Amino acid sequence: MTNLNLPSLFVPLVGLVFPAIAMASLFLHVQKNKIV
Protein backbone atom coordinates (compact mmCIF):
# COMPACT_ATOMS: atom_id res chain seq x y z
CA MET A 1 0.00 0.00 0.00
CA THR A 2 1.51 3.28 -1.11
CA ASN A 3 0.67 6.67 0.31
CA LEU A 4 0.01 8.02 -3.19
CA ASN A 5 -3.24 6.06 -3.44
CA LEU A 6 -4.56 7.39 -0.14
CA PRO A 7 -5.70 10.89 -1.25
CA SER A 8 -7.36 9.59 -4.41
CA LEU A 9 -9.27 7.14 -2.21
CA PHE A 10 -10.27 9.64 0.49
CA VAL A 11 -11.37 12.51 -1.76
CA PRO A 12 -14.35 10.70 -3.39
CA LEU A 13 -15.15 9.01 -0.08
CA VAL A 14 -15.41 12.33 1.79
CA GLY A 15 -17.01 14.02 -1.23
CA LEU A 16 -19.80 11.43 -1.41
CA VAL A 17 -20.25 10.29 2.19
CA PHE A 18 -20.31 13.74 3.83
CA PRO A 19 -23.11 15.19 1.64
CA ALA A 20 -25.06 11.94 2.02
CA ILE A 21 -24.86 12.19 5.82
CA ALA A 22 -25.77 15.89 5.67
CA MET A 23 -28.82 15.20 3.47
CA ALA A 24 -29.91 12.28 5.67
CA SER A 25 -29.61 14.29 8.89
CA LEU A 26 -31.50 17.19 7.31
CA PHE A 27 -34.23 14.84 6.10
CA LEU A 28 -34.57 13.26 9.56
CA HIS A 29 -34.62 16.71 11.17
CA VAL A 30 -37.45 17.84 8.88
CA GLN A 31 -39.36 14.59 9.44
CA LYS A 32 -39.06 14.90 13.22
CA ASN A 33 -40.22 18.52 13.33
CA LYS A 34 -42.99 18.07 10.74
CA ILE A 35 -42.07 21.30 8.95
CA VAL A 36 -43.31 20.03 5.59
From Swiss-Prot:
Membrane topology of this protein: Single-pass membrane protein
Keyword Hydrolase appears in the UniProt entry: no
Transmembrane segments: 8-28
Any Pfam family matching the protein: PSI_8
Compartmental location: Plastid, Chloroplast thylakoid membrane
Keyword Chloroplast included in the entry's annotation: yes
Keywords noted in UniProt: Chloroplast, Membrane, Photosynthesis, Photosystem I, Plastid, Thylakoid, Transmembrane, Transmembrane helix
Name of protein: Photosystem I reaction center subunit VIII
Species this chain originates from: Brassica oleracea (Wild cabbage)
Top-level taxonomy: Eukaryota, Viridiplantae, Streptophyta, Embryophyta, Tracheophyta
